[in-house]
Amino acid sequence: MTSADSLLFTSLGPSPSSGDGDCKFNEEFKFILLPLSYAVVFVLGLALNAPTLWLFLFRLRPWDATATYMFHLALSDTLYVLSLPTLVYYYAARNHWPFGTGFCKFVRFLFYWNLYCSVLFLTCISVHRYMGICHPLRAIRWGRPRFAGLLCLGVWLVVAGCLVPNLFFVTTNANGTTILCHDTTLPEEFDHYVYFSSTIMVLLFGFPFLITLVCYGLMARRLYRPLPGAGQSSSRLRSLRTIAVVLTVFAVCFVPFHITRTIYYLARLLNAECRVLNIVNVVYKVTRPLASANSCLDPVLYLFTGDKYRNQLQQLCRGSTPKRRTTASSLALVTLHEESISRWADIHQDSIFPAYEGDRL
Protein backbone atom coordinates (compact mmCIF):
# COMPACT_ATOMS: atom_id res chain seq x y z
CA MET A 1 0.00 0.00 0.00
CA THR A 2 1.40 3.40 -0.96
CA SER A 3 1.82 6.26 1.50
CA ALA A 4 -1.14 8.00 -0.11
CA ASP A 5 -3.30 4.94 0.38
CA SER A 6 -2.27 4.68 4.00
CA LEU A 7 -3.41 8.25 4.51
CA LEU A 8 -6.87 7.69 3.07
CA PHE A 9 -8.35 6.82 6.41
CA THR A 10 -6.84 9.90 8.03
CA SER A 11 -8.72 12.21 5.70
CA LEU A 12 -11.82 10.19 4.95
CA GLY A 13 -12.43 7.65 7.63
CA PRO A 14 -14.08 8.01 11.02
CA SER A 15 -12.62 10.20 13.67
CA PRO A 16 -10.12 8.60 16.02
CA SER A 17 -12.75 8.34 18.74
CA SER A 18 -14.80 5.94 16.65
CA GLY A 19 -12.78 2.95 17.55
CA ASP A 20 -12.51 1.97 13.88
CA GLY A 21 -8.94 3.08 13.45
CA ASP A 22 -8.10 0.00 11.39
CA CYS A 23 -10.76 0.71 8.76
CA LYS A 24 -9.15 1.33 5.40
CA PHE A 25 -11.03 2.70 2.41
CA ASN A 26 -10.54 1.08 -0.96
CA GLU A 27 -10.43 4.14 -3.20
CA GLU A 28 -8.69 2.90 -6.29
CA PHE A 29 -11.78 3.88 -8.30
CA LYS A 30 -11.33 7.50 -7.24
CA PHE A 31 -7.98 7.85 -8.94
CA ILE A 32 -9.63 7.02 -12.27
CA LEU A 33 -13.14 8.44 -11.87
CA LEU A 34 -12.31 11.89 -10.51
CA PRO A 35 -9.48 12.89 -12.90
CA LEU A 36 -11.50 11.77 -15.93
CA SER A 37 -14.77 13.35 -14.80
CA TYR A 38 -13.16 16.64 -13.74
CA ALA A 39 -11.27 16.79 -17.05
CA VAL A 40 -14.52 16.32 -18.98
CA VAL A 41 -16.28 18.97 -16.88
CA PHE A 42 -13.37 21.36 -17.44
CA VAL A 43 -13.40 20.96 -21.23
CA LEU A 44 -17.17 21.04 -21.64
CA GLY A 45 -17.75 23.70 -18.99
CA LEU A 46 -15.19 26.06 -20.48
CA ALA A 47 -16.39 25.41 -24.04
CA LEU A 48 -20.00 26.13 -23.08
CA ASN A 49 -19.60 28.99 -20.61
CA ALA A 50 -16.86 31.05 -22.27
CA PRO A 51 -18.96 31.76 -25.41
CA THR A 52 -21.94 32.40 -23.16
CA LEU A 53 -20.06 35.09 -21.25
CA TRP A 54 -18.88 36.64 -24.52
CA LEU A 55 -22.41 36.76 -25.92
CA PHE A 56 -23.85 38.25 -22.75
CA LEU A 57 -21.11 40.89 -22.56
CA PHE A 58 -20.92 41.93 -26.21
CA ARG A 59 -24.04 40.81 -28.09
CA LEU A 60 -26.97 40.62 -25.69
CA ARG A 61 -26.97 43.95 -23.93
CA PRO A 62 -28.75 45.68 -22.31
CA TRP A 63 -29.82 42.86 -20.00
CA ASP A 64 -33.17 42.26 -18.45
CA ALA A 65 -33.38 40.77 -14.96
CA THR A 66 -33.29 37.14 -16.05
CA ALA A 67 -30.30 37.74 -18.31
CA THR A 68 -28.55 39.31 -15.33
CA TYR A 69 -29.09 36.17 -13.27
CA MET A 70 -27.93 33.98 -16.13
CA PHE A 71 -24.77 36.00 -16.70
CA HIS A 72 -23.79 35.63 -13.06
CA LEU A 73 -24.61 31.93 -13.23
CA ALA A 74 -22.29 31.54 -16.23
CA LEU A 75 -19.59 33.58 -14.48
CA SER A 76 -19.78 31.35 -11.42
CA ASP A 77 -19.50 28.23 -13.56
CA THR A 78 -16.53 29.61 -15.49
CA LEU A 79 -14.59 30.52 -12.36
CA TYR A 80 -15.13 27.04 -11.01
CA VAL A 81 -14.07 25.10 -14.10
CA LEU A 82 -10.85 27.13 -14.25
CA SER A 83 -9.84 25.55 -10.92
CA LEU A 84 -10.43 21.97 -12.06
CA PRO A 85 -7.02 21.28 -13.70
CA THR A 86 -5.42 21.33 -10.25
CA LEU A 87 -7.87 18.70 -8.99
CA VAL A 88 -7.29 16.61 -12.10
CA TYR A 89 -3.59 16.61 -11.27
CA TYR A 90 -4.22 15.95 -7.57
CA TYR A 91 -6.29 12.82 -8.06
CA ALA A 92 -4.25 11.58 -11.01
CA ALA A 93 -1.19 11.84 -8.74
CA ARG A 94 -3.01 9.71 -6.16
CA ASN A 95 -3.83 12.40 -3.59
CA HIS A 96 -0.62 14.40 -3.86
CA TRP A 97 -1.05 18.19 -3.65
CA PRO A 98 2.08 20.22 -4.52
CA PHE A 99 0.37 23.62 -4.80
CA GLY A 100 0.47 24.71 -1.16
CA THR A 101 -2.06 24.97 1.67
CA GLY A 102 -3.43 28.34 0.59
CA PHE A 103 -4.35 27.17 -2.88
CA CYS A 104 -5.85 23.98 -1.42
CA LYS A 105 -8.14 26.11 0.71
CA PHE A 106 -9.02 28.29 -2.28
CA VAL A 107 -9.89 25.39 -4.60
CA ARG A 108 -12.08 23.66 -1.99
CA PHE A 109 -13.71 27.02 -1.21
CA LEU A 110 -14.34 27.63 -4.91
CA PHE A 111 -16.17 24.30 -5.25
CA TYR A 112 -18.77 25.22 -2.62
CA TRP A 113 -18.89 28.85 -3.71
CA ASN A 114 -19.85 27.79 -7.21
CA LEU A 115 -22.23 25.13 -5.92
CA TYR A 116 -24.26 27.40 -3.68
CA CYS A 117 -24.08 30.48 -5.91
CA SER A 118 -25.50 28.31 -8.70
CA VAL A 119 -28.28 27.10 -6.40
CA LEU A 120 -29.19 30.66 -5.41
CA PHE A 121 -29.00 32.06 -8.95
CA LEU A 122 -31.30 29.29 -10.16
CA THR A 123 -33.60 30.10 -7.25
CA CYS A 124 -33.58 33.78 -8.25
CA ILE A 125 -34.54 32.78 -11.79
CA SER A 126 -37.31 30.58 -10.41
CA VAL A 127 -38.77 33.32 -8.22
CA HIS A 128 -38.46 35.83 -11.06
CA ARG A 129 -40.31 33.49 -13.40
CA TYR A 130 -42.96 32.79 -10.79
CA MET A 131 -43.56 36.51 -10.25
CA GLY A 132 -43.74 37.19 -13.99
CA ILE A 133 -46.29 34.44 -14.60
CA CYS A 134 -48.39 34.48 -11.44
CA HIS A 135 -47.97 38.10 -10.26
CA PRO A 136 -47.05 40.18 -13.34
CA LEU A 137 -47.75 43.59 -11.81
CA ARG A 138 -45.42 42.91 -8.90
CA ALA A 139 -42.86 41.51 -11.34
CA ILE A 140 -42.74 44.84 -13.17
CA ARG A 141 -41.94 46.64 -9.95
CA TRP A 142 -39.45 44.18 -8.46
CA GLY A 143 -38.06 42.60 -11.62
CA ARG A 144 -35.94 45.48 -12.86
CA PRO A 145 -32.36 44.78 -13.99
CA ARG A 146 -30.88 47.08 -11.34
CA PHE A 147 -32.61 45.13 -8.58
CA ALA A 148 -31.44 41.86 -10.14
CA GLY A 149 -27.85 43.13 -10.27
CA LEU A 150 -27.91 44.12 -6.61
CA LEU A 151 -29.43 40.77 -5.70
CA CYS A 152 -26.68 38.93 -7.59
CA LEU A 153 -24.04 40.95 -5.77
CA GLY A 154 -25.73 40.01 -2.52
CA VAL A 155 -25.64 36.33 -3.49
CA TRP A 156 -21.89 36.44 -4.14
CA LEU A 157 -21.19 38.19 -0.84
CA VAL A 158 -23.58 36.16 1.33
CA VAL A 159 -22.34 32.80 0.04
CA ALA A 160 -18.71 33.87 0.40
CA GLY A 161 -19.37 35.06 3.95
CA CYS A 162 -21.11 31.84 4.92
CA LEU A 163 -18.21 29.79 3.58
CA VAL A 164 -15.41 31.69 5.34
CA PRO A 165 -15.17 29.01 8.09
CA ASN A 166 -14.43 26.49 5.35
CA LEU A 167 -11.13 28.28 4.77
CA PHE A 168 -10.15 27.44 8.34
CA PHE A 169 -11.37 23.84 8.30
CA VAL A 170 -9.73 22.82 5.01
CA THR A 171 -6.00 22.18 5.22
CA THR A 172 -3.21 19.99 3.95
CA ASN A 173 -1.52 17.10 5.70
CA ALA A 174 1.92 15.68 4.90
CA ASN A 175 3.09 12.10 5.25
CA GLY A 176 6.54 11.63 3.83
CA THR A 177 6.51 12.89 0.24
CA THR A 178 2.70 12.76 -0.04
CA ILE A 179 0.60 15.85 0.74
CA LEU A 180 -3.16 15.53 1.11
CA CYS A 181 -5.56 18.39 0.36
CA HIS A 182 -8.52 17.58 2.61
CA ASP A 183 -11.98 18.12 1.19
CA THR A 184 -13.38 18.29 4.73
CA THR A 185 -10.90 18.80 7.58
CA LEU A 186 -8.55 16.98 9.93
CA PRO A 187 -10.08 14.01 11.83
CA GLU A 188 -9.97 15.80 15.18
CA GLU A 189 -12.05 18.68 13.77
CA PHE A 190 -14.50 16.54 11.82
CA ASP A 191 -17.39 16.78 14.31
CA HIS A 192 -17.28 20.57 14.22
CA TYR A 193 -17.04 20.54 10.44
CA VAL A 194 -20.18 18.41 10.15
CA TYR A 195 -22.20 20.89 12.22
CA PHE A 196 -20.94 23.78 10.10
CA SER A 197 -21.50 21.95 6.80
CA SER A 198 -25.00 20.84 7.80
CA THR A 199 -26.00 24.40 8.68
CA ILE A 200 -24.71 25.64 5.34
CA MET A 201 -26.59 22.88 3.53
CA VAL A 202 -29.90 23.84 5.15
CA LEU A 203 -29.45 27.57 4.56
CA LEU A 204 -27.96 27.56 1.07
CA PHE A 205 -29.51 24.42 -0.40
CA GLY A 206 -32.50 23.22 1.64
CA PHE A 207 -34.46 26.47 1.77
CA PRO A 208 -33.65 27.56 -1.82
CA PHE A 209 -34.58 24.12 -3.16
CA LEU A 210 -37.90 24.24 -1.31
CA ILE A 211 -38.60 27.73 -2.67
CA THR A 212 -37.78 26.55 -6.20
CA LEU A 213 -40.13 23.57 -5.92
CA VAL A 214 -42.98 25.74 -4.63
CA CYS A 215 -42.47 28.37 -7.35
CA TYR A 216 -42.41 25.85 -10.17
CA GLY A 217 -45.34 23.93 -8.75
CA LEU A 218 -47.45 27.09 -8.75
CA MET A 219 -46.14 28.07 -12.18
CA ALA A 220 -46.99 24.67 -13.65
CA ARG A 221 -50.52 24.87 -12.28
CA ARG A 222 -50.94 28.31 -13.87
CA LEU A 223 -49.37 27.30 -17.19
CA TYR A 224 -51.54 24.24 -17.63
CA ARG A 225 -54.68 26.36 -17.60
CA PRO A 226 -56.12 26.50 -21.14
CA LEU A 227 -55.28 29.77 -22.89
CA PRO A 228 -56.31 30.60 -26.49
CA GLY A 229 -53.76 31.60 -29.10
CA ALA A 230 -50.68 29.98 -30.63
CA GLY A 231 -48.35 32.66 -29.27
CA GLN A 232 -49.42 31.89 -25.75
CA SER A 233 -48.88 28.17 -26.35
CA SER A 234 -45.31 28.92 -27.47
CA SER A 235 -44.72 31.01 -24.36
CA ARG A 236 -46.09 28.30 -22.12
CA LEU A 237 -43.89 25.73 -23.84
CA ARG A 238 -40.74 27.76 -23.19
CA SER A 239 -41.73 28.29 -19.58
CA LEU A 240 -42.36 24.57 -19.11
CA ARG A 241 -38.95 23.87 -20.64
CA THR A 242 -37.45 26.22 -18.07
CA ILE A 243 -39.10 24.25 -15.29
CA ALA A 244 -37.80 20.98 -16.73
CA VAL A 245 -34.21 22.22 -17.14
CA VAL A 246 -33.89 23.78 -13.69
CA LEU A 247 -35.43 20.79 -11.93
CA THR A 248 -33.15 18.48 -13.92
CA VAL A 249 -30.09 20.40 -12.73
CA PHE A 250 -31.28 20.07 -9.15
CA ALA A 251 -32.20 16.40 -9.54
CA VAL A 252 -28.97 15.37 -11.28
CA CYS A 253 -26.37 17.63 -9.68
CA PHE A 254 -27.43 18.99 -6.32
CA VAL A 255 -29.84 16.55 -4.68
CA PRO A 256 -27.75 13.33 -5.00
CA PHE A 257 -24.63 15.10 -3.78
CA HIS A 258 -26.28 16.52 -0.67
CA ILE A 259 -28.09 13.29 0.17
CA THR A 260 -25.00 11.08 -0.13
CA ARG A 261 -22.81 13.61 1.67
CA THR A 262 -25.27 13.74 4.58
CA ILE A 263 -25.34 9.93 4.80
CA TYR A 264 -21.54 9.85 4.63
CA TYR A 265 -21.18 12.36 7.46
CA LEU A 266 -23.75 10.55 9.60
CA ALA A 267 -22.02 7.21 9.05
CA ARG A 268 -18.79 8.66 10.34
CA LEU A 269 -20.40 10.43 13.29
CA LEU A 270 -22.34 7.29 14.30
CA ASN A 271 -19.23 5.09 14.04
CA ALA A 272 -20.70 2.79 11.41
CA GLU A 273 -18.90 -0.45 10.71
CA CYS A 274 -16.10 -0.44 8.17
CA ARG A 275 -18.04 -2.21 5.41
CA VAL A 276 -20.84 0.37 5.60
CA LEU A 277 -18.36 3.21 5.62
CA ASN A 278 -16.70 1.91 2.47
CA ILE A 279 -20.02 1.61 0.63
CA VAL A 280 -21.16 5.07 1.68
CA ASN A 281 -17.77 6.55 0.80
CA VAL A 282 -17.91 5.11 -2.72
CA VAL A 283 -21.42 6.44 -3.34
CA TYR A 284 -20.48 9.86 -1.99
CA LYS A 285 -17.37 10.10 -4.16
CA VAL A 286 -19.38 9.14 -7.25
CA THR A 287 -21.78 12.06 -6.70
CA ARG A 288 -19.02 14.67 -6.40
CA PRO A 289 -18.52 14.84 -10.19
CA LEU A 290 -22.30 15.18 -10.54
CA ALA A 291 -22.19 18.30 -8.38
CA SER A 292 -19.48 19.69 -10.65
CA ALA A 293 -21.49 18.83 -13.75
CA ASN A 294 -23.89 21.70 -13.07
CA SER A 295 -21.29 23.87 -14.82
CA CYS A 296 -22.07 21.93 -18.01
CA LEU A 297 -25.84 21.66 -17.55
CA ASP A 298 -26.53 25.31 -16.71
CA PRO A 299 -25.85 26.49 -20.31
CA VAL A 300 -28.64 24.19 -21.48
CA LEU A 301 -30.99 26.58 -19.71
CA TYR A 302 -29.93 29.41 -22.03
CA LEU A 303 -30.30 27.25 -25.15
CA PHE A 304 -33.72 25.84 -24.33
CA THR A 305 -35.34 29.04 -23.18
CA GLY A 306 -33.91 31.84 -25.30
CA ASP A 307 -34.49 32.30 -29.03
CA LYS A 308 -32.19 35.31 -29.39
CA TYR A 309 -29.41 33.66 -27.40
CA ARG A 310 -29.72 30.52 -29.51
CA ASN A 311 -29.64 32.50 -32.76
CA GLN A 312 -26.60 34.51 -31.69
CA LEU A 313 -24.79 31.33 -30.64
CA GLN A 314 -25.57 29.66 -33.97
CA GLN A 315 -24.13 32.64 -35.84
CA LEU A 316 -21.04 32.53 -33.65
CA CYS A 317 -20.54 28.80 -34.32
CA ARG A 318 -20.96 29.31 -38.08
CA GLY A 319 -18.36 32.04 -38.02
CA SER A 320 -20.75 34.65 -39.36
CA THR A 321 -20.90 38.16 -37.98
CA PRO A 322 -23.56 38.30 -35.27
CA LYS A 323 -26.17 40.98 -35.45
CA ARG A 324 -25.69 44.08 -33.41
CA ARG A 325 -26.61 44.02 -29.76
CA THR A 326 -30.14 43.13 -28.88
CA THR A 327 -31.93 43.31 -25.62
CA ALA A 328 -31.28 40.15 -23.67
CA SER A 329 -34.46 38.57 -22.46
CA SER A 330 -33.92 35.00 -21.45
CA LEU A 331 -37.23 33.49 -20.56
CA ALA A 332 -40.72 33.75 -21.92
CA LEU A 333 -43.77 34.99 -20.05
CA VAL A 334 -47.34 33.95 -20.57
CA THR A 335 -49.21 36.63 -22.49
CA LEU A 336 -51.86 38.27 -20.37
CA HIS A 337 -54.75 39.96 -22.14
CA GLU A 338 -56.39 41.86 -19.33
CA GLU A 339 -56.93 45.34 -20.73
CA SER A 340 -56.16 47.08 -17.48
CA ILE A 341 -52.83 45.31 -17.18
CA SER A 342 -51.87 46.19 -20.75
CA ARG A 343 -52.64 49.87 -20.15
CA TRP A 344 -50.64 49.78 -16.93
CA ALA A 345 -47.71 48.14 -18.71
CA ASP A 346 -47.71 50.79 -21.45
CA ILE A 347 -46.92 53.40 -18.82
CA HIS A 348 -43.85 51.44 -17.72
CA GLN A 349 -42.05 51.01 -21.02
CA ASP A 350 -38.70 50.63 -19.26
CA SER A 351 -39.81 47.47 -17.49
CA ILE A 352 -38.44 44.08 -18.43
CA PHE A 353 -41.88 42.82 -19.44
CA PRO A 354 -43.08 45.22 -22.17
CA ALA A 355 -46.77 44.64 -22.84
CA TYR A 356 -46.35 41.26 -21.18
CA GLU A 357 -45.47 39.57 -24.44
CA GLY A 358 -43.27 36.51 -24.38
CA ASP A 359 -39.66 37.59 -23.88
CA ARG A 360 -37.19 35.79 -26.08
CA LEU A 361 -33.45 35.90 -25.61
UniProtKB/Swiss-Prot annotation:
A molecular function GO annotation: G protein-coupled UTP receptor activity
Tissue: Expressed in the liver, intestine, stomach, bladder and lung.
Assigned keywords, A-Z: Cell membrane, Disulfide bond, G-protein coupled receptor, Glycoprotein, Membrane, Phosphoprotein, Receptor, Transducer, Transmembrane, Transmembrane helix
PROSITE patterns membership: G_PROTEIN_RECEP_F1_1, G_PROTEIN_RECEP_F1_2
Recorded superkingdom: Eukaryota
InterPro entries recorded: GPCR_Rhodpsn (IPR000276), GPCR_Rhodpsn_7TM (IPR017452), P2Y4 (IPR000018)
Record: glycosylation sites: 175
Disulfide bridges in this chain: 104-181
Regions of this protein lying in the Extracellular compartment: 1-30, 92-108, 171-192, 266-283
Keyword Phosphoprotein: yes
Any one GO BP annotation for this protein: transepithelial chloride transport
Membrane-spanning parts: 31-58, 69-91, 109-127, 150-170, 193-218, 243-265, 284-305
Post-translational modification: Phosphorylation of Ser-329 and Ser-330 is a key step in agonist-dependent desensitization and loss of surface P2RY4. This phosphorylation does not involve PKC, nor other calcium-activated kinases.
GO cellular component: plasma membrane
Functional summary from the UniProt entry: Receptor for ATP and UTP coupled to G-proteins that activate a phosphatidylinositol-calcium second messenger system.
UniProt record similarity statement: Belongs to the G-protein coupled receptor 1 family.
Name of the molecule in the record: P2Y purinoceptor 4
